[in-house]
């Protein structure tokens, strides 16, 4: 059984590039494996995907696979000398022309920069380490004054906070990566630099062309996403609070409260939420986290996040398994000693009301568990957002849904056969749970499901059930 309720997402990379390395992460507590399409070749991701599936089969644990698209990342071009030092007060030019970069003039991958920029706009380079301000636009060049100096080098990222940029939601690379990931068989897709709810439409269009739809996660890292938060949550299947780029694009001091607000809105809408970036960053090169990092992880848990994510800590860190074990300890301790704020919104949908009622009945009867029998995963997510202290057991006949629920708070998943009636459903639950040490005949559980079974989004039934009752009646 899962003692830890909050899930852990681990980024794969050179530090774990083997079946043994990935199996080590699974055994340490990884729930979702992240394929970061910003790095590595398709062959690397294909190998990692295969090793995750092999490790899942060997361990018997359900692990989801998430493909994270790079998005339309804007970068500087290359410098003749590789690196230059820009000092405060200097004038530099960033051009849309394809030139070899010098101290005074360098190109950018964003070919509409001169069209979109206007005097007063800020450009942040290398995650904000260097800052410049547009003073004028001279044909193909944006003439800038350096306001915060530092080194600039080949292909460094450029952030354009507040600038109304005209880039598509998906680059050509993203489209190729998306098609590759769908054909590979990943369980979820994350879309970077989401600015509006309409950004999901192009992803769905390509999914339909490939004949396969999977959940799409909106990565919140742009000011436009902050402003359109509620509509983005409704349009996408889940959200990721990508605090690295977000903290560059919006004032850093606003990020913590935005995190709390985003988690609350996602929970109200039964959408899983991941908190990401620099959670245990020092453990890339150290065996212990800082006290501030431990507090950050615990705070995300107490905010109500479904999952916390590791990036470089597991992809290139010195001891990825130790990082996962450390995060698991921090999470478990926070869950044991803290309390997530209860949801205060009043559900108005049938599925919402039924999920609240199932939780209330189970807790008042001191049931052994809440069991969600689900076709799409929605029933389990609606119960999970309530953060009951009771175990949440999710049964589904679909392997893909089982893997997708690896991201959902508290959900322990079981693969069942297709059922045609409520009696079939109870029998499948009895057979699975009575084969486990934790449950015995006569234990009371509360089952939430849709009837007739097999219809997605039809949650309409609560049944108080004693384990073994169905088997005794045969």
Model-derived regions: residue spans:
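Non-catalytic helical/linker scaffolds that mediate oligomerization, partner binding
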Residues: 1-474
């Amino acid at each position: 059984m899962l003692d830890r309720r909050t899930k852990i997402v681990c980024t794969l990379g050179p530090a774990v590039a083997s079946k043994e390395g990935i199996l080590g992460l699974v055994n340490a507590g990884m729930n979702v494996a992240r394929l970061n399409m910003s790095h590595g070749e398709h062959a690397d991701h294909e190998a990692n995907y295969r090793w995750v599936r092999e490790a899942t089969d060997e361990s018997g644990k359900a692990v989801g696979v998430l493909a994270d698209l790079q998005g339309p990342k804007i970068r500087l071009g290359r410098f003749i000398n590789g690196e230059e030092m820009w000092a405060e007060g200097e004038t530099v030019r960033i051009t849309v022309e394809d030139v070899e970069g010098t101290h005074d003039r360098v190109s950018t991958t964003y070919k509409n920069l001169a069209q979109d920029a206007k005097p007063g706009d800020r450009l942040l380079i290398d995650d904000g380490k260097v800052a410049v301000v547009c003073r004028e636009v001279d044909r193909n060049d944006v003439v800038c004054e350096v306001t915060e100096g530092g080194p600039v080098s080949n292909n460094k990222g450029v952030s354009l906070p507040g600038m109304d940029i005209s880039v598509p939601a998906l680059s050509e690379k993203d489209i190729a990566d998306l098609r590759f990931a769908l054909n590979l068989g990943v369980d979820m897709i994350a879309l970077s630099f989401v600015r509006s709810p309409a950004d999901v439409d192009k992803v769905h269009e390509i999914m339909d062309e490939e004949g396969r739809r999977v959940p799409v996660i909106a990565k919140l890292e742009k000011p436009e996403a902050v402003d359109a938060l509620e509509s983005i949550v409704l349009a996408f299947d889940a959200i990721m609070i990508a605090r690295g780029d977000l903290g560059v694009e919006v004032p850093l001091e606003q990020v913590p409260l935005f995190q709390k607000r985003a988690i609350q809105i996602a929970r109200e809408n039964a959408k899983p939420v991941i908190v990401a970036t620099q959670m245990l960053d020092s453990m890339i090169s150290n065996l212990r986290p800082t006290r501030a990092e431990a507090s950050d992880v615990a705070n995300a848990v107490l905010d109500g996040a479904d999952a916390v994510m590791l990036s470089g800590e597991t992809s290139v860190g010195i001891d990825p398994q130790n990082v996962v074990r450390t995060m698991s300890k921090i999470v478990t301790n926070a869950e044991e000693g803290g309390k997530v704020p209860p949801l205060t919104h009043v559900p108005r949908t049938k599925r919402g009301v039924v999920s609240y009622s199932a939780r209330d009945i189970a807790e008042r009867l001191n049931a052994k568990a809440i069991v969600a029998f689900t076709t799409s995963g929605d029933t389990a997510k609606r119960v999970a957002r309530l953060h009951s202290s009771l175990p949440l057991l999710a049964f589904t006949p679909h392997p893909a849904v089982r893997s997708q629920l690896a991201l959902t708070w508290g959900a322990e998943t079981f693969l069942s056969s297709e059922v045609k009636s409520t009696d079939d459903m109870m029998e499948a639950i009895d057979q699975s749970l009575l084969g486990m040490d934790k449950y015995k005949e006569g234990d009371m559980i509360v089952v939430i499901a849709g009837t007739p079974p097999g219809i997605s989004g039809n949650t309409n039934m609560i049944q108080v059930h004693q384990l073994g009752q169905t088997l005794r009646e045969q």
